[in-house]
From Swiss-Prot:
Protein name per UniProt: Elongation factor Ts
Keyword Protein biosynthesis: yes
InterPro entries reported for this sequence: EF-Ts_dimer_sf (IPR036402), Transl_elong_EFTs/EF1B (IPR001816), Transl_elong_EFTs/EF1B_dimer (IPR014039), Transl_elong_Ts_CS (IPR018101), UBA-like_sf (IPR009060)
Stated role: Associates with the EF-Tu.GDP complex and induces the exchange of GDP to GTP. It remains bound to the aminoacyl-tRNA.EF-Tu.GTP complex up to the GTP hydrolysis stage on the ribosome.
Family stated for the protein in its record: Belongs to the EF-Ts family.
HAMAP family, sorted: EF_Ts
Length: 289
């Protein structure tokens, strides 16, 4: 059966998101049976997803969803920023984080098994998206946190932060989350900085201080002062608040009767070796699939 109506092709395209020619080819192979054609395209999509799984996906978005004292952050990667800006990709990411939150998912496996609003799993939606877009799409990281007060902040879809507080309100928690996105602290308080990191900094400061030629007791005071300054720079509570540098974050939360319990910050592509490509190459990769 080669006489396939345009209406049937259009319906299959709307259901699968695939191209017109691919839909017509599938309908011809299925003798006009749209259900069979859709199923064969899903199987084909699975094969395409498997083929693309080895390709580096270092672009993408961070999505955050917070409700009922629980927050979840997802990093979902694509191969190119071109796709990361695509509305279909963004919609998938938003559906995935909502589904993961509803399922109280804490691992990648649990995220992928979570059901989206249309009844399919995140994994099924991911593979369908790969077949449609033609890039490797990966749910790379999931982080969760529970607290009395939560504040979420996303910067340009590339940095996502959740601040967890005891006391205070959501506005305060959002301000803290925004600060974390901008200042990128290592820990909440100075006493949480790993001992080996402090030791390394002390070694560097000691060498620098000795070059000054000052007496030993002065050198010791210099080292203590520099270590204290270092801890303030890398610890959230010791940092100057980005919206009002005249006060420390510690004072900001204390004045509101709150305490910072934890924060989570995800940056798209952290730790992934990215392949440098120019825009023309990126567009060509889209055309070639």
């Amino acid at each position: 059966m080669s006489n396939i109506s345009a209406k049937l092709v259009k319906e299959l395209r709307e259901r699968t998101g695939a191209g017109m020619m691919e839909c017509k080819k599938a309908l011809v192979a299925a003798a006009g049976d749209i259900e069979k054609a859709a199923e064969e395209m899903r199987i084909s999509g699975q094969a395409k997803a498997d083929k693309k799984a080895s390709r580096v996906a270092a672009e993408g978005v961070i999505e955050v969803y917070a409700a009922d004292g629980r927050a979840i952050l997802l990093e979902i990667n694509s191969e190119t920023d071109f796709v990361a800006r695509d509305e279909t990709f963004k919609k998938f990411a938003q559906e995935a984080v909502k589904a993961a939150h509803a399922a109280n998912a804490k691992t990648i496996e649990e995220v992928l098994a979570a059901k989206t609003s249309n009844g399919e799993t995140v994994e099924e939606a991911r593979k369908s998206l790969i077949a449609k877009i033609g890039e490797n799409i990966q749910v790379r990281r999931v982080k969760t946190v529970e607290a009395e007060t939560l504040g979420a902040y996303i910067h340009g879809s590339k940095i996502g932060v959740v601040a967890a507080l005891e006391g205070g309100d959501e506005d305060l928690a959002k301000d803290v989350a925004m600060h974390v996105a901008a200042a990128n602290p290592m820990v909440v308080s100075g006493d949480q900085v790993p001992a080996d990191v402090v030791a390394k900094e002390k070694e560097i400061f000691t060498a620098q201080a000795k070059e000054s030629g000052k007496p030993a007791e002065i050198i010791e005071k210099m080292i203590v002062g520099r270590i204290r300054k270092f801890l303030d720079e890398v610890a959230l509570l010791g940092q100057d608040f980005v919206k009002d540098p005249a006060i420390k974050v510690e004072k900001l939360v204390k004045d509101k009767g709150a305490k910072v319990v934890n924060f989570i910050r995800l940056d798209v592509g952290e730790g992934i070796e990215k392949k440098e490509e120019d825009f023309a190459a990126e567009v060509m990769s889209q055309i070639k699939g």
